[in-house]
UniProtKB/Swiss-Prot annotation:
EC number(s) stated in the UniProt entry for this protein: 7.-.-.-
Membrane topology type: Multi-pass membrane protein
Function: Part of a membrane-bound complex that couples electron transfer with translocation of ions across the membrane.
Enzyme class, first EC level, given as a word: translocase
Keywords: Cell inner membrane, Cell membrane, Electron transport, Membrane, Translocase, Transmembrane, Transmembrane helix, Transport
Assembly behavior: The complex is composed of six subunits: RnfA, RnfB, RnfC, RnfD, RnfE and RnfG.
Record-stated family: Belongs to the NqrDE/RnfAE family.
GO biological process: electron transport chain
Localization, UniProt: Cell inner membrane
Protein name per its UniProtKB record: Ion-translocating oxidoreductase complex subunit A
Superkingdom of the organism of origin: Bacteria
Listed Pfam families: Rnf-Nqr
């Protein structure tokens, strides 16, 4: 049980995919202008990343490894991610049309989000069991969502702040992301792998 807790905390805080591994920066910068869209994107990414990691583990261990087709891992995982994203898009369109309109182009872009593919590949490369792989995917998604929501909240406050003209817009957003990354470096001694 302690191993699972350490895996969760380590993935969410210490080895955050956005601020430490620099994966998923496109949606991180693109969807974080409004808190509502960041929350929606975080929930959609959490759903997709968790399911994609689980299905990728299953396909790898039941099909690719037994048939010695591990060289097709990346292509197979991209296909899994695309199917999960299409399923998520259909669910979001039916359950929350407002969220579907709010996410707009970013929902299909989850397919090309390098963080989703990176989590699936890293989970396999780290030789996780099924439960560890599922928890790793969920933890990475929670870390991604946490950072996106925090960043969106900060960016909303920066809109009304008195920011010097050369730093307005993306410049102050990048400075803020760098400061957040430094803040998350403080968690580096929390969990040792």
């Amino acid at each position: 049980m302690t191993d699972y807790l350490l895996l969760f905390v380590g993935t969410v805080l210490v080895n955050n995919f956005v601020l430490v591994k620099f994966l998923g920066l496109c949606p991180f910068m693109g969807v974080s202008k409004k808190l509502e869209s960041a929350i929606g994107m975080g929930m959609a990414t959490t759903f997709v990343m968790t399911l994609a990691t689980i299905f990728s583990w299953i396909i790898d261990h039941l099909i690719l490894v037994p048939l010695e087709l591990v060289y097709l891992r990346t292509m197979a995982f991209i296909l899994v991610i695309a199917v999960v994203v299409q399923f998520t898009e259909m669910v979001v369109r039916k359950t929350s049309p407002a969220l579907y309109r709010l996410l707009g182009i970013y929902l299909p872009l989850i397919t090309t989000n390098c963080a989703v593919l990176g989590v699936a590949l890293l989970s396999i490369n780290l030789n996780h069991t099924f439960m560890q792989s599922a928890l790793y995917g969920f933890s990475a998604a929670v870390g991604f969502s946490l950072v996106m929501v925090l960043f969106a909240a900060i960016r909303e406050r920066l809109v009304v702040a008195d920011v010097p003209l050369p730093f307005r817009g993306n410049a102050i957003a990048l400075v803020t992301a760098g400061l957040m990354s430094l803040a998350f470096m403080g968690f580096s001694g929390l969990v040792k792998f």
